[in-house]
Design a protein with these regions (language model features):
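Short aromatic/hydrophobic "clamp" motif used to bind/position activated sugar donors
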Residues: 123
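Acidic helix N-cap motif at the loop->helix transition within catalytic regions
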Residues: 57-60, 84-93, 135
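Short, flexible, basic/aromatic active-site loop/helix in glycosyltransferases
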Residues: 154-160, 168-190
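A conserved acidic beta->alpha catalytic loop
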Residues: 65, 81-89, 130
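Acidic donor-binding loop at a coil-to-helix junction in glycosyltransferase catalytic cores
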Residues: 215-221
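N-proximal low-complexity "stem/linker" segments adjacent to membrane-targeting elements
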Residues: 1-65
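Conserved donor NDP-sugar-binding/catalytic core segment of glycosyltransferases
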Residues: 135-166
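Glycine-rich, basic loop-to-helix element that forms the pyrophosphate-binding segment
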Residues: 102-118
Length: 287
């Protein structure tokens, strides 16, 4: 008896994920371009900022998922190319996404570049190696506009592959999510990831990204958003995004779980802080 495969919302996007741009069907590109153009507003409430650096193999799938957003709010798409050496810029052009080139190479610089161009009252951060379910933007904005909320974030899953079965990933994500939900009580800024993060543009422009950081610019921005209200995590499964394995270096799920528990520990789960020491090796080195 053949194994039955239950179709997931992201399966069609995986059909081009990690493939060279030359293998992406032109019908997919043209369809996405048409849908993105219909969604693009000149008077947006929400600015969707997509950052990419050498992401030819992943950006098309991300844009495909964004082109199928079902959103009641006016939105705009802004691409940022962090001076890629591959066909990233060409992909933005082919899909009809207005984009800017940021020559300084950190995620902070790229996100700040997009933030500076945002016309919407709300900015939603998008990572180009990530795929977004169809109601993601609308639901995140719904939650952000609730009283007392200054920022929103969502959870993420990894797609199954040859090294990680669906069952393995479900187990890993169950324990990881439990840890993150507890951590979110006292230190939500540590749970935020830039791939699923949104805030009010005006507040973010006042604070600015810490562009000198090699990593953690998203958590730093989240920390600064606490001045303006509460960071809300949206646990609705319709907001759970699917991403690649860039943030999961270990092939073994048990090794990944042990590494995170050993590195992060449990002590910080039960205390609050508004200050973190920067690691000396986490700064952009001037050339």
């Amino acid at each position: 008896m053949k194994n039955l495969h239950i179709m997931e919302w992201y399966d069609k996007y995986l059909s081009i994920y990690e493939k060279p741009y030359s293998e992406v069907p032109q019908t997919v590109v043209e369809g996405c371009r048409e849908r993105l153009a219909k969604l693009q507003s000149y008077e947006p409430l929400v600015s969707i900022v997509i950052v990419a650096y050498n992401e030819e193999r992943r950006l098309p799938a991300c844009l495909w998922s964004l082109s199928e957003q079902q959103c009641k709010y006016p939105i705009e798409f802004i691409g940022v190319d962090n001076e890629s050496k591959d066909r990233t810029a060409e992909i933005y052009q082919a899909f009809g996404v207005p984009y800017y080139t940021e020559h300084q190479h950190t995620c902070g610089y790229a996100r700040q570049c997009g933030l500076n161009q945002a016309k919407g009252r709300i900015t939603m951060c998008i990572d180009c190696d990530t795929m977004y379910p169809p109601h993601y933007i609308e639901l995140m904005v719904d939650n952000l506009q609730q009283p007392g909320i200054s920022a929103v974030a969502a959870m993420w899953s990894y797609y199954p592959n040859e090294d990680h079965s669906k069952l393995q990933m479900k187990m890993y994500e169950f324990f990881r999510d439990c840890y993150l939900k507890i951590q979110n009580i006292n230190r939500p800024e540590l749970t935020v990831r830039g791939l699923a993060f949104g805030y009010y543009t005006e507040n973010a422009l006042k604070e600015g990204y810490r562009v000198e950081l090699l990593r953690g610019e998203d958590g730093s921005m989240a920390l600064s958003m606490k001045k303006y209200g509460k960071i809300k995590f949206v646990y609705d499964k319709r907001c759970r995004v699917i991403t690649g394995y860039g943030g999961l270096k270990e092939k073994s799920i048990l090794a990944a779980m042990w590494h995170r528990l050993k590195f992060y520990g449990v002590g910080r789960l039960f205390s609050k802080t508004d200050h973190y020491e920067d690691a000396p090796d986490n700064f952009l080195k001037n050339k």
